[in-house]
A protein has these predicted regions:
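HotDog/MaoC-like acyl-thioester-processing domains
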Residues: 2-5, 11-12, 17-23, 78-79, ...
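A short small-residue
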Residues: 25-31
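A conserved, well-ordered hydrophobic junction motif at loop->secondary-structure transitions
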Residues: 32-44
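Hydrophobic beta-strand-centered segment that forms part of the acyl-chain substrate-binding groove
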Residues: 16-18, 38, 52-86, 90-97, ...
Length: 166
């Protein structure tokens, strides 16, 4: 499978696994809000960092965050819990890409409970901070194809919202 179906795309392609990133964070007192749970802004920082690392690995350029979709907090996170943040590219355009970031709390026995999922749009920048072309994305599995198709739908919705001034 290829990133551009029906078109000849001469760009070099990279696998999803080439740029995937996983980080872990121990929740400390400095990360907590007044209710004793992980501060949402801290989690957003970790998500953005992982999305940026995925983007940088894929694009091999500096990256900026253009937008975040579907940022939903499913469960709270508490002191001394371990947060696992996993990012991967789901869609690649000419200069931008979508990065899916999943977040889990990992228990002491290694079991992971999902707490968050978000989709970031990242744009690659050249030395003059202008958008620059990036490698294509090689789609190899049915799951990656499903993610690609879903990402295209989300992209269309973002474009429509932009046209509406939102």
């Amino acid at each position: 499978m290829r990133s551009k179906k029906g078109e000849e795309d001469m760009r070099r392609e990279k696998r999803v696994s080439d740029s995937s990133v996983e980080t872990m964070h121990a929740v400390r007192p400095v990360h907590l809000n007044g209710a004793g749970r992980l501060f949402g802004g801290q989690l957003m920082e970790w998500l953005d960092e992982v999305a940026g690392l995925v983007g940088r690995r894929h694009a091999e350029h500096n990256i900026t965050t253009a937008s975040v979709d579907n940022l939903r907090f499913i469960h709270g996170v508490y002191l001394d819990e371990v947060v696992v943040v996993i990012g991967k590219a789901t869609y690649v355009g000419k200069t931008s890409m979508e990065v899916r970031v999943d977040t889990y709390v990992e228990s002491k026995d290694g079991m992971r409970r999902p707490i968050n999922r978000a989709y970031f749009t990242m744009v690659a920048l050249d030395e003059k901070d202008k958008p620059t072309e990036i490698p294509g994305l090689l789609i190899e599995t049915e799951e990656e194809k499903w993610e690609w198709d879903a990402a295209k739908k989300r992209r269309e919705m973002r474009m429509k919202r932009r046209e509406e001034g939102f």
